[in-house]
């Protein structure tokens, strides 16, 4: 009887150690791109105060456009609340360009297709929960 409990204890301990170190991933796919010039910027945020402008709380990538679809997988993420901001950096200058009046001159989209009034959407509108793995497909509108 003691031996059986010993094995149950060891199996339970081993299982909990495996789950403790487990991380999640987010696969982001941008579809129906309307041009092959420039690059796609994808920002992944977990901090409401920095969304979508600051580098704090952001993991970002720039992807070369080779086709009408690009994708990236963010790995080794802790479970939690995240939001995504994407823009088409057509001139590859690393910035989200705006007109003299402040209107965007490059295509953009946010997770949940969230929209803001006279600016970006709130983190709450664009956010989603990451528990294991998430697949997000977005298209510029």
PLM segments and residue spans:
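Acidic, glycine-anchored loop motifs typical of Ca2+
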Residues: 90-96
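Short strand-edge motifs at loop-to-beta-strand transitions and within beta-strands
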Residues: 68-72, 124-126, 134-136
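Beta-strand signatures of extracellular beta-sandwich domains
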Residues: 41-45, 85
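Short, flexible loop/turn segments at beta-strand junctions in immunoglobulin-like
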Residues: 74-77
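Short proline/glycine- and polar residue-rich coil/turn motifs
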Residues: 63-68, 130
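A short, amphipathic beta-strand motif
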Residues: 24-33
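A short tyrosine-centered beta-strand micro-motif
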Residues: 80-86
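Bacterial Sec-dependent N-terminal signal peptides
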Residues: 1-25
């Amino acid at each position: 009887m003691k031996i059986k409990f010993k094995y149950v204890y060891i199996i339970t301990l081993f299982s909990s150690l495996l789950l403790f170190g487990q991380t999640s991933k987010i696969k982001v796919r941008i579809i129906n791109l309307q041009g092959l010039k420039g690059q796609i910027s994808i920002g992944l945020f977990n901090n409401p105060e920095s969304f979508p402008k600051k580098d704090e709380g952001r993991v970002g990538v720039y992807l070369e456009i080779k086709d009408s679809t690009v994708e990236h997988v963010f790995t080794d993420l802790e479970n939690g609340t995240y939001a995504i901001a994407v823009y088409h950096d057509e001139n590859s200058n690393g910035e989200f360009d705006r007109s003299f009046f402040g209107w965007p001159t490059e295509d953009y989209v946010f997770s949940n297709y969230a929209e803001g009034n006279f600016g970006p959407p709130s983190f709450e509108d664009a956010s989603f929960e990451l528990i294991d793995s998430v697949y997000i497909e977005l298209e510029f509108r």
